[in-house]
């Protein structure tokens, strides 16, 4: 299971935000890609909030405007339940491309849970930022390489 605690590039949200809903953006993004010219998207394709009319933005935790909608809370509860039920078992805390923008959300908790669970392992793939604390070094794999290439190599 995946929990996009930091957001999802596949969702729009109001840039204000005037409400706590997100919207699937795949169709709109594909249309933007198809119709862009000279690296510009036609202004009529720029998404607008259906409630207040302000521009929409990606659903990413970049500042205090991040929208946590019903789906986010449902996924957060699933994640919490998983950790409660399986956090003492053999588990791999896999981190893909997590930097130091908000390390307290993913990185530090993963390190902490790895240190506290003798059966846990930590792995990160992040070009330029693959590291772990000395305390969990013996049960960690840090790959300082391009994620896309690593996944292609793993999948053969």
Describe each model-derived feature in a short phrase.
Residues 1-156:
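Conserved catalytic alpha/beta core of Sir2/sirtuin-type deacylases, generalized to analogous enzyme cores
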